[in-house]
Amino acid sequence: MIGDPRQLGNPSDITHPGDSGLSVLDFILGEKNTVPPNLGIFLSTTRRMRSEITPFISESFYDSRLNSHPITDKRSLKLEGNPLPHHSGIVLVEMEHQDNAQSSKEEIEVIAKLYSYFLTQKFIDEGIERDISADDILVVAPYNVQVNLIQKKLPEGNRTGTVDKFQGQEAPISILSMTSSDGDNAPRGINFLMDEARLNVAVSRAQCLSIILINKELFNVHINSINQFKLKNNFLKLKQKSSVIEVNKLNL
């Protein structure tokens, strides 16, 4: 058996009693994040994410067992007049909006400006420099309403979709729009919006730079269970591991 139970499973509309709906890997691992040596082999090296991105993913979802291959740091972005704090790693843009549920025009405007900027910049892969194209930027949102609005705002050929669409894919740059203003406005609740597997997949699509647009109030979301405590804690850890910039300080 080969797989990653820390990412999204196959969707199913069927209800199973007890644990009978678990995948084989989930059933074997139980509460464990990674497979122990006596049960299998954990592939501990990523050839996608630069070493600035991997620590958050590794510590949050893989028991700190995941490391970046040296080849990943041979990919870089050449950004002139960069409006962000860094050229690589995880950048968290703190947004300020209210009453947004399935769409956020504020986040769409920022995404459009970042997208236009990146299309004027360069990507370097093992010493070979080229222009950044639409294929080099993934834009991810939790809700189809936001996805559709972003697609209409960006140039034709943009790679915009939900997390489910992009699992298994990669790009030098990823931009995640969290969309909802707070937990109360999140249509499917924080169990969906802040889901561990979705966060893992969204951030880990990036080879060089992962950008997260998130409203400040989501860090203060009210929790009602131990599971929700874990979800909130992941985002607090994300903030700690990111370069944080307030949206009004972006020079776009």
Show the residue positions of the predicted features.
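Conserved helicase motor core of SF1/SF2 NTP-dependent helicases
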Residues: 1-252
